[in-house]
Amino acid sequence: MFRQNNIVLIGNSVVEQSKSIAHLNKKVINIDSFNDRDLKGENYKNSDPYGLVNDDVISILQSLELAKEDTLILVSSGYDSSNDFYEQLKKFGMIISNSYKSISDIQNNSNLIAKLKSNNIKIPEIFSLEQSKKEEKVIIKNSSSSGGFGIKIFNKNLNQDTLENYEYCQKFIKGQTYSVLFISNKDKKFEIVGVNKIFNKKTLHTNFCFSGAESNIKLNKKQIQYLESVIEFFISEYELIGLNGIDFIISKDIYFLEINPRITQTCFLYNNSFEHGFVKAHIDVFLNKDLPSIKDTGNTSVAFETLFSNTKFIFNHCLLEYDFISNIPKVNTSINVGDPICTVNITSEDGKKVNKLLSDNISLIKNKLTNIEII
């Protein structure tokens, strides 16, 4: 067990992280943009909707007066670009997340695309604005965000001034989206934790909002070998450590979509794959050289789906009675159109039944939340 007694979790949905380490008898401080009711530990609200490290986060940490040498800080979101918040954060403890340089280099989209191509990693074709107008279906992507945020369907009436400098046009690929979760250490060794089937929905904010996943998806040997080569590229090029995820789509070929150099929302699907949970496994590879052992869970599948609101309302429900619900808002929380309401989970030892069981649980909650239009 590591010696530090304070663990700070920073993000926009850290409920499952806080649950993963609740048994470690450490002081857990959650600085979360949702500040949900089922967080485990001391909870503080971050005004940034994406959970970015900003002035709010720094002020909260200053007020807590935690001993630097006794504090670990996990960032599963990112950093506000208005200041050098990574350096400021280092004053309060050891950061157990990828370096700001690694994250910034990955967000340099033109360089990343060039490196992917030179390493024979397939990506959907990139178009200029004028080229896009001649194509059948194109999407506009945001290089500084993830989880489907900022993705728009291309409109042929757009002009050059419409695109921001962080946006680019990319061919829309038909197929199923997946993610591969891996854990790596300082020696650039890694293990694949699992492959997930990804769900997304159209909300007020984006056409392709990440809404959930199903774990323990089986791919063939050739596909896994290809994904391993992609992971090796990112670890070598960007020195990634800990838990990270890569999104990809399988059509005729495998196409890389994006890299998430952080603990992702899918990590909790594999909490039981690690002896002491996924967050401790992530911490351990930063503090030690050894990769954790990953348990074989057989045919067990875990799945979750986030329910979004298509109605503005005040949340006045108690869902704590349901053990398959997480990310539960506090009573009297204002929910706007496009906002998440809660997350529905299911675990099944028979992977073939997981989707039906998840659907049943979703129906139960929809019946509970009457007079609310739910996506």
Name these PLM-found stretches.
Residues 1-101, 359-360, 370-373:
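ATP-binding N-terminal substructure of ATP-dependent carboxylate-amine bond-forming enzymes
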Residues 7, 139-141, 182, 253-263:
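A short beta-strand motif that forms the metal-chelation/ATP-contact edge
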Residues 91-158:
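A conserved helix-loop-beta module that forms one wall/lid of the active-site cleft
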Residues 121-124, 139-140, 149-179, 204-214, ...:
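Conserved ATP-binding module of the ATP-grasp superfamily
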Residues 184-190, 250-253, 287, 310, ...:
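Short acidic-glycine loop/turn motifs at beta-strand connectors
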Residues 240-252, 294:
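A short glycine-rich, hydrophobically flanked beta-strand micro-motif that places a catalytic Asp/Glu
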Residues 280-375:
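Peripheral (often C-terminal) accessory segments that flank ATP-dependent C-N-forming ligase machineries
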